[in-house]
Amino acid sequence: MKRLLSLLTVVTFVAIPNYSYAQNAELVLEEVVVTATKKEENVQDIAQTVNAVTGSTLDDYQIRDLSELAQVVSGVEFTKIDPRRATIIMRGQKLDPDGGNDQPIQGYIDEVPLRAQDVFSQMYDTERVEILKGSQGTLQGVVSTAGAIQIYTRSAQVGSGEKNGYVKTMWADNMTSMVEAASDLHLTDTLSIRVAGLRNASDGNEIRNIRTQMNESHHFDSGRISLSWQPSDELSVRFKYQNSETDSIYPQPVAGSNGTPSYEQVVNGYVSQIAFFESLGFAPAGSAAQLAYLHRPTYNDIPAGGLKATDGVALHFQNPRQNNSAEIHNLMIDYDMGSHALALRFSNSQNDAMGLIDRDYAGAYVYGYPQEVRTNTGIETVEMRISNQDSDKLEYTIGFFSRDSQTFTTADLDRSFSITEVAPAMFTPAVGFDYKTPNQACNAARAAPGSMAAKSWVLTCMEIPLDNKTEAYFANFKYNLTDKTFVQFGFREQEIVGYRAQNLYLPLTALLTQASGGGMTIPRIAAADQNSNVDSTTGSFKIGHYINEDMLLYVTTETGFRSPGLTISPIAINPSLLTFVEEESDMTEIGMKGTFMDGRLRINAAYFDYTIDNFQSKWDNVSAREYTRAGPGNVTQVQGGIFTNNDAEVSGLDIEYAYVVNENTVLGGSYSSNDSEYAAGSIGYANNPAYTGFAAATQDVSGTPVSDAAESSLNFYLDHTTPAYWGGERYTRYNVSWRDERTSAINSEVKIKALYLANIIVGWRSADDVWDASFFVKNITDDVDLSNIQG
């Protein structure tokens, strides 16, 4: 959900920021240098789509996190489902935070591959963001079929007496406040330290829980230390340490009505019938009185017409809370050997995430349905690469990459509603009374296995270890046939060794006795399926030709790969549903990059086409047969989702432009479209309560989109500056973005309407750029979008 923002920013600078366009009489666009190819290169010379957003652009348009990047870059969508989970859509493919499989999009901070939740933390003191669209099967650390996001933070500057510190403060509606600061400390001529930090607080979308009186709130704190040491012109050593913590309370808003008749009406009618039969002697005395204990949820505080998503109202008993803490250590060594350049990268990242939710979003259960997921992740990466610098004819990069990822997740639920709903005055669940959270209850049960034997509770405690070790060798060669024509090819050989397990522990209680499995630990993944070893080969081939020194035409082909895997299901389902095979893709991109009008106009355009074999899709809320010790059980809804493999095709267009109108005005924008569909004969899983089979409900998805990505999106920006008669200069910035209407992936009958966002920033800065004050309004039309639907 988006909302109107009315914000005031005061920025104190002690250095002149960099701008992405020239601000002098020459009226030319500045060269944009990126490292998408693992070396510094003009983005106009790269034979693939790369959208670069400079740090000054992020500051100028008040872009604070990835979810706002789509305002200046089309063809990408960034959505925070909740503070623990986030999705990214690029070229029609979607990163799923709950997938457990290789993702089509990978995020990086300073070349360190991270989980989506870490990449989605608020950006600050950022040098630039590079959005690499298309398959990344050669040079990037992790193979990703749809693209990659590279975030580069500012490093300490060595040997410069320039002061580049700043303090920024911001206040906004919805109780939003932000303080950001950074500065270099020059210790010696060869050693500098940069310190940066951010503190942010807000009430988000101001969702309110009318049952618990708890309102939405978010707090984010982060600090970063960057050390740069350059003992000689040949050697550069950088070390960065970042620590961040997010703490959020986020009630989940609902939409809808009670329906006709309501649950309360049905139950009251049933009780009155029992009372009537009791009066006639056909039912035992006291039958109606016993049923009076049955919980009947009432919604007297909800309007007769029901609730809309824009009302921002939550109804659940438990208060959802998310906490995420992360640490990143990153060592970067670069050595210029004359004919070659050596780069070494070592990183270690740790993440602890806790998510407490109430799965009873509608507030139908008197004590709710609490679930707690805790995930601890540790990732170590090593990368070594060497590039030649002594030949204008043949350029190459050869390297080794290693990534060791260890993840441990617990997913704990209190399912005592089976008895508390019948007699809430007599029975209470574990969570909210004896224990604060499901994880605390499960830990207590493991520590003292028989301590809950007399309690009328039902707890399920899941442990999911997931380890992966990736080792890869890669090489990329560029051969300049002439001054105008080049060919480029690369390959990557990788091996992925994995381990996964899923163990369900059922604490012994009065309702879950030893005879029904209480006290047991049940492995959900067979021992033969716990270990995996996968090899893959991916690569690229590119041809580029310069029509002149300002226009490049190119054709690129690149392959992608996603490993086979096993569905991690919260319930026991038919084993035949669990496995999915590897995905292989071939992407072709045909593009043009050009600079015109003596450097005042830049236009880049590309057409892309994917052919994907065994595309991995996860289907949520699937109706499937549950299996118990006794055999097939009831048909239930699988919340975690089940994977399928189907062939698919994706194609589309990316266009971006920038134009210097005059010395005071610059404008630009981008447009993207994508068309994706499953091949003929494709089968997906479905939510069908009428299903009576022994596996899972299915549906024909032939010709339907592979995700709920918008088919078209565009944005436009304009920056106008004029001298202020009282000194300094005034500026006005306009930013408009639009995203097409789309169909919900959960319910094909639900349409997510087109989203139109308009932002305006006005400000005044001093002539020497020492200070800057601005006022801005985001979403000035107060347009509202459903960014995520959970069914």
Question: Where are the predicted features?
Answer:
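Outer-membrane beta-barrel translocator/receptor signature
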Residues: 103-104, 124-127, 133, 138-223, ...
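Gram-negative outer-membrane beta-barrel transporters
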Residues: 389, 395-396, 480-487, 606-611, ...
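Outer-membrane beta-barrel domain signature, strongest for Gram-negative TonB-dependent receptors
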Residues: 212, 218-397, 403-405, 602-604
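C-terminal beta-signal and adjacent terminal beta-strands/loops
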Residues: 618, 667, 735-745, 764-791
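Membrane-embedded beta-barrel scaffold of Gram-negative outer-membrane proteins
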Residues: 332-337, 341-347, 352-357, 546-562, ...
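Structural signature of Gram-negative outer-membrane beta-barrels, strongest in the C-terminal barrel
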Residues: 228-232, 386-389, 395-403, 464-612, ...
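Acidic, small-polar-rich N-terminal luminal/periplasmic segments of exported/outer-membrane proteins
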Residues: 27-158, 590
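Solvent-exposed loop segments that connect transmembrane elements
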Residues: 207-214, 251-314, 358-371, 412-463, ...
